[in-house]
Amino acid sequence: MDLVTKLPQNIWKTFTLFINMANYLKRLISPWSKSMTAGESLYSSQNSSSPEVIEDIGKAVTEGNLQKVIGIVKDEIQSKSRYRVKIAVTGDSGNGMSSFINALRFIGHEEEDSAPTGVVRTTKKPACYSSDSHFPYVELWDLPGLGATAQSVESYLEEMQISTFDLIIIVASEQFSSNHVKLAITMQRMRKRFYVVWTKLDRDLSTSTFPEPQLLQSIQRNIRENLQQAQVRDPPLFLISCFSPSFHDFPELRNTLQKDIFSIRYRDPLEIISQVCDKCISNKAFSLKEDQMLMKDLEAAVSSEDDTANLERGLQTYQKLFGVDDGSLQQVARSTGRLEMGSRALQFQDLIKMDRRLELMMCFAVNKFLRLLESSWWYGLWNVVTRYFRHQRHKLVIEIVAENTKTSLRKALKDSVLPPEIH
């Protein structure tokens, strides 16, 4: 302690500044590694990959073999092309669910394969319909309506096995009842995709004294206010007439449905896989930061090269370990046939510019001070300080490379794996 107190005043101030800077950077680095999950709001889905496929993907990511990852995922996503998407149509009895299914399929109620319709309750048990010409590999399930019995919404949904469906369409007409609100609350809690469809708009227009725009606005406002009061986020809302399947919101409904079917079949499974990849990359980054042998090998080179060269060599090492070096990226680009994806690894000069923390840690003043501490007069006393600071820089580079790997892999998977979306 006597030695420290006898330090020249300007050196002591520099040392104090250095310690404060180290503590500040440590606070900055720590929360950065706690990345936000990309799919926190992902819808629940029955269309998931097998544990064996997930294990193979995770192993390839850990090995840094992104080309192998893309190959496995591509085969997996292609196998989803014939996944049968299950859509449930539900609501209060008498809301016109069966008529809606017929209109969605562009068939009349008099046709042989149509869902039975009528004034009295016609659907007493779940019935499955399809429309291969408009919605291939999609099951449209006409569920018995709520409200005919004293059955609670919870027991009704359990009986209908609602958790097995990929998308739920809540049909309403005349009034948006408490049952509709309860259905919406439950769908949100279960993280299910769902729509609200207001049918029989033709009847509303024929009996209302309000102009059409005002009536439509009033219906929409009433539904949204009821949902907001129940703290339900705004779902897609469509106002339609089953007798006019080409007018009002019906075309928009079909377009939205086609896109969501595509998402259920392809995008949702890919997002789940991407989250697995992200987690494996994060785990690998954590292991590398704790790898003492790797740090010692890199540290051994400090005496023969300056800090910048040492950190640049570290960047190249980490990129090879994660599979995002120039050679690996070029292989990925060639194998996917998408050279425009980019086959250039992150460069050191770009690395410094893209992260303010690393730029601060590599500034002239810090490097000069580290060199001062390495002199023969200081080495024995302050070696632990310089080693700690260098380790923090390497750990930060590992985190940056890991995040860059996540971004690059997600883009490569999206560009090379997803089939063209139906518009």
UniProtKB/Swiss-Prot annotation:
It comes from Mus musculus. It catalyses: GTP + H2O = GDP + phosphate + H(+). Belongs to the TRAFAC class dynamin-like GTPase superfamily. IRG family. Residues 83-260 form the IRG-type G domain. Disruption phenotype: Mice do not show obvious abnormalities, but are more susceptible to infection by Toxoplasma gondii. In contrast, normal clearance of Listeria monocytogenes and cytomegalovirus infections is observed. Macrophages from knockout mice show impaired envelopment of parasites in autophagosome-like vacuoles. Mice lacking both Irgm1 and Igtp/Irgm3 display resistance to Mycobacterium tuberculosis infection compared to Irgm1 mice that are highly susceptible to infection. CDD domains: p47_IIGP_like. The gene is Igtp. It is found in: Endoplasmic reticulum; Cytoplasmic vesicle membrane; Lipid droplet. Immunity-related GTPase that plays important roles in host resistance to acute infection by protozoan, such as Toxoplasma gondii and Leishmania major. Acts as a dynamin-like protein that binds to intracellular membranes and promotes remodeling and trafficking of those membranes. Acts predominantly to restrict acute protozoan infection: expression is required in both hematopoietic and non-hematopoietic cellular compartments and is dependent on Stat1. Only plays a partial role in the control of latent Toxoplasma infection. Its EC number is 3.6.5.-. GO terms for biological process: autophagy; CD8-positive, alpha-beta T cell differentiation; cellular response to interferon-beta; cellular response to type II interferon; cytolysis in another organism; defense response to protozoan; innate immune response; negative regulation of PERK-mediated unfolded protein response. GTP binds at residues 92-99, 117-121, 200-202. This is Immunity-related GTPase family M protein 3. InterPro entries: G_IRG_dom, Immunity-related_GTPase-like, IRG, P-loop_NTPase. One of its GO terms (cellular component) is lipid droplet. Its main location: endoplasmic reticulum. One of its GO terms (molecular function) is GTP binding. Keywords: Autophagy, Cytoplasmic vesicle, Endoplasmic reticulum, GTP-binding, Hydrolase, Immunity, Innate immunity, Lipid droplet, Membrane, Nucleotide-binding. Induction: Expression is induced in response to IFNG/IFN-gamma. Expressed in response to Toxoplasma gondii infection. The keyword Disulfide bond does not apply.
